[in-house]
């Protein structure tokens, strides 16, 4: 089973794959920057329910994640910065050098070769934390930096039928 799309699609697809026949293997092919550095790694899948974010979900890691950064050339600025914000968070919880590289990145004139390596590094940061704490009982909570408050804003925006992007 291949799941091709942004974070909403990979979340829904991962949840469906984990439920179908009590779980089938799936391969994530994320197409947005946020999906590449966040939703595609770690196996947290979920859907909104009753006006609340990610109320129904499971931990169901993909058997494989295929990252093709050529998809990123099609992103508008809004979607690019949604994912870039997540990468900055990874820089904050990683090394000063990683954060400096992210902060020095020219978002006005995107170097896609450099972005590809930065995506890889961001994914490695998340993978390292997820491997240490797969079910989010300890260090993995660092990945939620901003999410706790952010989810409250997202839920409010959903209730008012004015959804916002997850990465901001």
Annotated model-derived regions:
Residues 14-107:
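A glycine/threonine-rich phosphate-anchoring loop and its flanking beta-alpha core
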Residues 11, 49, 55, 128, ...:
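Short leucine-rich amphipathic alpha-helices used at interfaces
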């Amino acid at each position: 089973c291949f799941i091709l799309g942004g974070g909403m699609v990979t979340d829904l697809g991962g949840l469906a794959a984990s439920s179908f026949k009590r779980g089938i293997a799936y391969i994530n092919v994320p197409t947005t920057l946020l999906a590449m550095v966040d939703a595609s790694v770690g196996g947290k899948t979920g859907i909104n329910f009753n006006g609340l974010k990610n109320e129904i979900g499971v931990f169901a890691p993909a058997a494989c994640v295929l990252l093709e950064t050529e998809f990123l050339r099609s992103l508008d600025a809004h979607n690019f910065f949604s994912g870039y914000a997540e990468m900055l968070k990874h820089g904050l919880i990683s090394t000063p050098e990683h954060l400096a590289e992210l902060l020095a990145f020219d978002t006005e004139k995107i170097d896609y070769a450099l972005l590809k390596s930065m995506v890889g590094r961001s994914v490695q940061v998340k993978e390292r934390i997820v491997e240490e704490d797969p079910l989010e009982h300890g260090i993995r909570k660092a990945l939620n930096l901003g999410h706790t408050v952010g989810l409250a804003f997202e839920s409010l925006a959903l209730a008012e039928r004015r959804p916002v992007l997850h990465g901001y």
